[in-house]
């Protein structure tokens, strides 16, 4: 089916408005190129660092900021390293190929340079990082980024970092509890570029409290001028665990036209500047019910994002709050994936007492044997 016919079908049979039909079609075509490289022996690894310097008021992720919990980081890394050893050993025993590694959080660069060296060094011991399609360090908060940390990341083979401002309006940043300024972001972005790490992602959020079309479009224009390889545009979403729900009931002030104008602006301007949409997903309770879209320069797609969202291969996760997703996407299943999940304890204290990794490894092996993948 041609691209034109796909868009026409989405519009006529599924009542998708033309601009969204075009967006969905463009994303699908880009994802097809990536998904087409996957087979049943491929997998990725997610490494959870669930600590942050402060907690954003809209955040509902597993992340901890108190000094008492931050003091757990040294012990956490030792426990995490042991779990990674067992997980990678199982991956090797099963004959799987690791395509991507993603270190997320939380804020992974809350680790010191020495702690980061310990973690990245351990991963380098366990897998050939030079053979990875992509190796991401989700740095996130600009106020945790230093040249020394990114030098360590580059030394150990990291190919993609995330430097996430969310907004370049200081009033908006202050209002959502971010402990950095727009200048801090610009400094961190320069550090990332000078590090020689080839791919930089920046996250932005449409519809943050106190934001407007004027301030958001200014933010987006400034980001475009920096030419990051990836720009991920999220629509503001508040979940039950978010602090902002206790602060104000008026959190969807951009429910109407401004949010839509901001979303449309990102899609128009990104295209004009040579970016293409490569992945997309929806969440509940977003401002204006809009989508989250990842844009990239040609050839700079964030491959882990596609593998994870489209559930085309297994992702083995280690760390507090981490969830492994084992996937069999073989033709004999009629095109429908068989998916099983394995959960680590949510809280760092519980994780440090957890001894279930051996059970998870056996579950991994049982899944692949049951699906006749080994």
What residue ranges belong to the model's regions?
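Short, flexible hinge/linker loops that cap or flank conserved catalytic cores
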Residues: 37-41, 50, 95, 129
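Broad gene-expression machinery/nucleic-acid interaction feature
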Residues: 42-44, 160, 303-305
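Beta-strand scaffold of nucleotide-dependent catalytic cores
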Residues: 48, 162, 231-235, 306, ...
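Flexible, acidic/Gly-rich N-terminal and inter-domain linker regions that tether
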Residues: 1-42
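Auxiliary Fe-S-binding modules of radical SAM enzymes
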Residues: 1-6, 238, 249-374
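Conserved acidic functional residues
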Residues: 48-50, 203, 281
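Canonical Radical SAM [4Fe-4S] cluster-binding loop centered on the CxxxCxxC motif
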Residues: 40-75
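Conserved non-cysteine loop/helix-boundary elements of the Radical SAM core domain that shape
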Residues: 63-266
